[in-house]
Amino acid sequence: MAKLSKQQKKQMYIEKLSSLIQQYSKILIVHVDNVGSNQMASVRKSLRGKATILMGKNTRIRTALKKNLQAVPQIEKLLPLVKLNMGFVFCKDDLSEIRNIILDNKSSSHPARLGVIAPIDVFIPPGPTGMDPSHTSFLESLGISTKIVKGQIEIQEHVHLIKQGEKVTASSATLLRKFNMNPSYGVDVRTVYDDGVIYDAKVLDITDEDILEKFSKGVSNVAALSRATGVITEASYPHVFVEAFKNIVALIIDSDYTFPLMKILKKWVENPEAFAAVAAPASAAKADEPKKEEAKKVEEEEEEEEDGFMGFGMFD
């Protein structure tokens, strides 16, 4: 088979990316700084059948995107994201599931590298370090407060060693190696493209429970505001009905006018002892349940003690 020319390879890449763009509407935009070929192969294997990863030169990616603007106009929003060491993950399955698979393939087997941009803040906790006093001057040069306790260096307070977005310095990398603290390297999912909508990948961390909780709080706030201002809304309907019923009861409790639910309330007001007598057996039964369970436990414990004594006598 003849070797493909540079132009042929470029054309094949553009055709492949064009095909994927038209086929998939959900894309994860990823960055692969400090990711080795073996680790990348592991990610591809884990995503097989669920998603397709495509890396490439940024110029080729832009060329392919621009060629498909007429067929898929919404992909124009991807153009500003084509920068640095990035690529696309074209997703068939749920985006959150794909992202979790990618995160599971992170590796922490390599020490921190000089000049690498820190993706997160790095803190050193206070406490014993296991380092001998000869390292005191090195730690003090980094502005770390220490003291010697039982022949080893102890850090006095939390140390913000590296800030997110900053480059790892030689001193910071050396200190992390001394503490045997290795950073996690892996494919970094940064942005989501969902059928023309672009949003931060952190949105995928939001669960259905989080949404329901926020919605419930919002409804409660609307209901409280509606009650305070006297403006009736759907959120305040339950409260309005309860208040209206209370007003009706207060108005007709001493009159001859009644309705089915009011009859029950009037009977309760006229003869509260009768309702108390009905409620008493039920409450008494509930109160007796813990006592019965406790008595049963005592009996079981006594039986166990007897059995244990008999067993001891047999083998003594």
UniProtKB/Swiss-Prot annotation:
Biased composition (Basic and acidic residues): 286-299
Any one GO MF annotation of this record: structural constituent of ribosome
InterPro entries: Ribosomal_protein_uL10 (IPR050323), Ribosomal_uL10 (IPR001790), Ribosomal_uL10-like_insert (IPR040637), Ribosomal_uL10-like_insert_sf (IPR043164), Ribosomal_uL10-like_sf (IPR043141), uL10_eukaryotes (IPR030670)
GO cellular component, one term: cytosolic large ribosomal subunit
Entry superkingdom: Eukaryota
Claim: rRNA-binding is one of the keywords in the record: no
Keywords: Phosphoprotein, Ribonucleoprotein, Ribosomal protein
Family matches, as Gene3D superfamilies: 3.30.70.1730, 3.90.105.20
GO biological process, one term: ribosomal large subunit assembly
Disordered: region residues: 282-316
UniProt modification remark: Phosphorylated.
A Pfam family assignment: RL10P_insert
Assembly: P0 forms a pentameric complex by interaction with dimers of P1 and P2.
Family statement drawn from the similarity comment of this UniProt entry: Belongs to the universal ribosomal protein uL10 family.
Function of the molecule: Ribosomal protein P0 is the functional equivalent of E.coli protein L10.
This protein's name: Large ribosomal subunit protein uL10
Organism: Plasmodium falciparum (isolate 7G8)
